[in-house]
C-alpha cells in the first residue's frame, strides 16, 4: 500500500507554531519507549505534501504549521482513494488546561495551553458511509473506514515518522479483554423494544433532546506509569489527542461531541493509591476527582489511563448512568495496546456506561456491523476480537431513553471558555464569522445554509440545525423549544435571535418533586417507584417495607448498601435501608437492565401476618462497580433523603438557604437563581407585579365589544318604538317628521281662509305659513264675501309652539294683498255657505296645507 499527500487546501492555519510553555522531561528506558506491534503489518507508505510548490515532506510542512484543510490521495489494496479532511475544531474548541507536577510536588497549571490542533476528520470520496480520523502531530496516525466491513489503521513506523504503517482493522485482535461496568450502577437505561417505543412516543411529545447536539467536556488523567511509558511529554500529548479524536468520532453519530478541556499528567508520582482491582481503583479515583480535580477544573467526565494491569480480563470500569454526577462521573482504563484504537475504544465503552448505555445483548437482538466472526460494536461486553468502532441500535435507544428520563442536563451547556479560536468552514460547528456550518458539501442537508461560504442563503433567518428555526425562519421569543421532562426540569424558550435553544436549566438540589416522594438531585427526580419502573417496567412498585428491610440489612448479592472497595457486600443500617439496593415487586418477569443471576423467595411473618418476599441477584457485568442502588435524592423518611447511600436530613442540600433569597415566592434552579411564581418579579421575587396579564386584558376587551354589539342589535330591533318614544319626549318638535299616518291632532278647519285662485299651478301665499293641513279646495267667491263680512270670527285654539312669522295687524279691513298677476275670474260658488270664511278685522286664521309650503317670498313682494 502506498500513500501520497497530493495537495493541501485552505491553508488558513498555516504559520509559525504557537508558543508553548516548557514541558517536563520525564525520561525513561528504551523498552518503555518502543512497543512491538500486535498485528500483522499490511504495508508501508511514504507521506509527502504537495502545495503550490514542488512536493514537500510532511516534516517540512510541519515546520511552518498545519493547514486547516487537507486533500490526500492514497492507495489501499491497489485502489486509489481521495481523503477530504478538515481540522477537528470541536476536539479542542478552546485552549485546554494542561497540568503537570514538578519534582518538589508543585502543581504546574497552564490554563489556555496553546496545544497545536494536529487532528483531522473527514471522509473518503465516493464512499458515503466512510469516515476518516487522522492526526499529524508527528507523522500520520489514525483510522480510515471505508465501510463497516473494511477499515485500516495508520501507525507510526519503527524509527521513521515519515513512513507510517498501514494495517487492516481485522488484524487488531484484543484477546481476552472484557469490560467491567461499575458496581455503582444507578438507573437502568435499556428497555425492550415494545416498552421503549411506547415510552419513546410519549416522551417525544414533551421534549426532543435526541436531535440536539450534546457536548461532553472531557478531562483525561495519565497516571505515573502512563507518563513513564511515553517519557517525551509531547508524545504523551499527541497520544492523548489521538484518543480524544477517536472518541469524538465514535460518538458523533449519536449527536454527542467530545471536547477535550484538560489533560493532567502525574509526572512525579501517583496522587491516589493504585490497585490492580479496578473497583478499588475506580473508588479511589472518583474520590480524588470529587475533592481535588472537579473544584479546580470544571468538566463532565474524567477518565484515568494507566499501564497498570487489572486483575482478570477487565480493561476498564465505570459507573452506570452517572454523567453529570459530581460523585460518580468517571472511569478507569488500562492502556492495553500499542494501537491507540484499542485504548480509545475502551475509553468510549466506559464513557458509554456513564451515558446510560448497557452492554449489547448477545445474539442478533443488537446486531453489529462488520465481517463475521468479528464484533465491531463499542458496547460489546467482551472485546475478544477487535475494538469496537460503532454503537449498535440498542445503544442508540438506550441513550435516547436515558436523555428523555432527564439524564445528561450538563451536556446541553456550552461554557464560554470553549469558544473556538478561529473559523473553519465545514467542521459542522459555527465558528466566529460564520452564520451556519453544515459540513462537507456531500453531507450538507441544510437548505438554509450555503456549505461553501458557511453563510445563510438569501431570505433565510437561521440554519435548521437548531430547534428555534423552522423553514429557515426564527421562532419568536418565548417559543417553547425544550419542554420539561420531569418534575425537576424547567422549560426553555427561544430567545428570538438564535436558532439554538438556551442551556438546559433544572431545579436546584433539594427542591421537592414527585409529590414529595423525592427531591431533585443533579437535575433528576428519583422517586423509588420510578426507579422500580425503570428496572422492571410499568406496574412495578417498591417492595413491602419488611421485605426491603430484611434484604438490605443482610448484606449479600440480594440486598446491601453497596460493595466495599475490596468487593464485599456491605449491609445497610436500619436507618439506611431505603438507600440500598432497589427492592421492587410486580412488573415484568425479566429486568430491563442486566439479567437475573439468581432468585430467592422467603416467607416472613410480621404482626401475625405472613408475607411472601422475593429477591433477585442481577448480573450487570463485571465492569459495573456497584449493584443497583437507590439514587441520591430518594426520600427515605420525613425530611430525610438519600445522600451518599445514607439517609440524611434534606437540609444538608442547602435548598432552604437558597430558597430564602426568593422570599417565599419562587424556587432555586440549578444555576442558583430564583424562578419566581407568576405575578412576582425576578431576581428576588420580592416585587409583586401589578400589571394585568395580557390574557386578562384580552378577555375584558372581548366582553366589552360583545356588550356593544348586543346593545346595537337591540336598538335596531326596537327602532320603531324608540323613535315614537323620542317623539313623545321632544313634544311637537317631532311632528313635522312624523309619518302622515300618525299626524298630531289639530283644530278643525278655520272659518276664514286665504283667498286664492283656481289655476293649475299653486298660487303664492301672501305670507309664510308653516305646513300643517290641506288648503281649502277652492277660494271663496267674491259675491259671498259681502254677506260674510259682518260675521264674527270663530273661536280658535292656540297654535303649536312653533316659530311663526306674523304680520303686524292693520287698522283697516283685512284684505289679502293683490297678487302680482291678475287673478282669474272667480269660479262659481261650489261650497256651502257654512264652509266659507267670514269677514273680520283681525288676521286671517292660518290654514295648514297638506304638502310642504314653498319658501316665503321676499319682504318686498308681500305688499304691492
Swiss-Prot record:
Compositionally biased spans, kind Polar residues: 34-45, 752-762
Translocase listed as a keyword: no
Membrane topology per record: Single-pass type I membrane protein
Substitution effect: residue 492 to A: Reduced binding to CHO cells expressing ITAG9-ITGB1
Cofactor annotation comment: Binds 1 zinc ion per subunit.
Subcellular localization(s) per the UniProt record: Endomembrane system; Cell junction, Adherens junction; Cell projection, Cilium, Flagellum; Cytoplasmic vesicle, Secretory vesicle, Acrosome
Bias-annotated ranges (Pro residues): 741-750, 768-780, 814-825
Name used for this protein in its record: Disintegrin and metalloproteinase domain-containing protein 15
Species: Mus musculus (Mouse)
